[in-house]
Amino acid sequence: MSPDKPFRIMGDVGELHILPPKYAYEVRNNEKLSFTMAAFKWFYAHLPGFEGFREGTNESHIMKLVARHQLTHQLTLVTGAVSEECALVLKDVYTDSPEWHDITAKDANMKLMARITSRVFLGKEMCRNPQWLRITSTYAVIAFRAVEELRLWPSWLRPVVQWFMPHCTQSRALVQEARDLINPLLERRREEKAEAERTGEKVTYNDAVEWLDDLAREKGVGYDPACAQLSLSVAALHSTTDFFTQVMFDIAQNPELIEPLREEIIAVLGKQGWSKNSLYNLKLMDSVLKESQRLKPIAIASMRRFTTHNVKLSDGVILPKNKLTLVSAHQHWDPEYYKDPLKFDGYRFFNMRREPGKESKAQLVSATPDHMGFGYGLHACPGRFFASEEIKIALSHILLKYDFKPVEGSSMEPRKYGLNMNANPTAKLSVRRRKEEIAI
């Protein structure tokens, strides 16, 4: 099989057409290759209980607009809140013990990320609500298991059997719980704003609940507020937790990076504090993150699409109608693009930024055919700027406040199944509190 030729495979979702990265540019914005339909086919977003997948691909695009605009543009205003929440939750999940103790890294980081993402998406009150934290932490896991259950059945039976499948039932229950929490919150806010207007005052909330509601009203479109939050959870929380956990594993296995990273944090934050500019200037950290994502993206193929018509590519290759299509990410490990591609080199992209014309390409948030950790093109992850800054804040806190190292005998090898590569969910790290050089 040539890595430069398209091929077909059979997976649990049926027939998949895998394209080499050279087609990424053609695929990226082709209107006959539907991102929305792919989500419906892959995740059954048309069925009850899977609304968290549906809302993120809503044709009104308000989710994408919020992630691309409000979330990105408001980062400067929420950075302090993210840092504050991070400091609080680390006391619970990593503890303040100066003695070495073991943690299951992915579980601990899920609790950390659930709190700090919810702080931005829902505000201070809800981000500490135990019921919401349980919902946001478990919905994607349960829904993905439900998807796997349904894939065992013929497509024509799925709308029927989903009413009897255990994880499908749990998914529907979590959606209802989310609505019972979020809808009253939104209604209360609307009443407060209406009352404030009557008295000539103004009430604003700088979080995703507000951004989504304002944008939906502005565009005159309907949306499901609770499922929009579940969609943010699916898109932001679980993928970010996986990415962040893998970064920690890679640093733990390359401990020579720890002191240079700490020195960079102290130099940058010591002078500039928390700001968009200071996070940009954490260039070694940015390089380490991008290298971690290069070696272990969330999947070995990206740019999931569904062909709504026969699609003829520039060299005559025809993608038949009604097929799921993806683009291979194998250039991540191709020596033609990366020297010693299987070696973890934390300075790889740090050094690349110094090469003429490559400063932009070498940044974590840049999406290219040879690094599709965040996808590529029109549907590249719109929340990658937020994810980048959120991870940098959390990693800065951990590097300054904790020592950490691998636990002997605990494998950090990613879990691979199908097209997926997940950070090992059972791997442990040994951590202990240290005295930070500067207050952050």
From Swiss-Prot:
Q: Does the keyword RNA-binding apply?
A: no
Q: What does this protein do?
A: GA14 synthase; part of the gene cluster that mediates the biosynthesis of gibberellins (GAs), diterpenoids that may provide a selective advantage during infection of the preferred host plant, rice. Gibberellins (GAs) are diterpenoids and are synthesized via the mevalonate pathway. Biosynthesis of the major metabolite GA3 (gibberellic acid) from geranylgeranyl diphosphate (GGPP) requires 13 steps.
* Gene name as annotated: P450-1
Induction line: Expression is induced under gibberellin-producing conditions.
For activity, the cofactor(s) needed are: heme
Q: Which Pfam families does its entry note?
A: p450
The pathway is: Plant hormone biosynthesis; gibberellin biosynthesis
- This protein is called what? Cytochrome P450 monooygenase 1
The record's section on SUPFAM superfamilies has: Cytochrome P450
Family designation: Belongs to the cytochrome P450 family.
Molecular-function annotations in GO:
heme binding; iron ion binding; monooxygenase activity; oxidoreductase activity, acting on paired donors, with incorporation or reduction of molecular oxygen
Q: Which GO annotations describe the biological process of this protein?
A: gibberellin biosynthetic process; secondary metabolic process
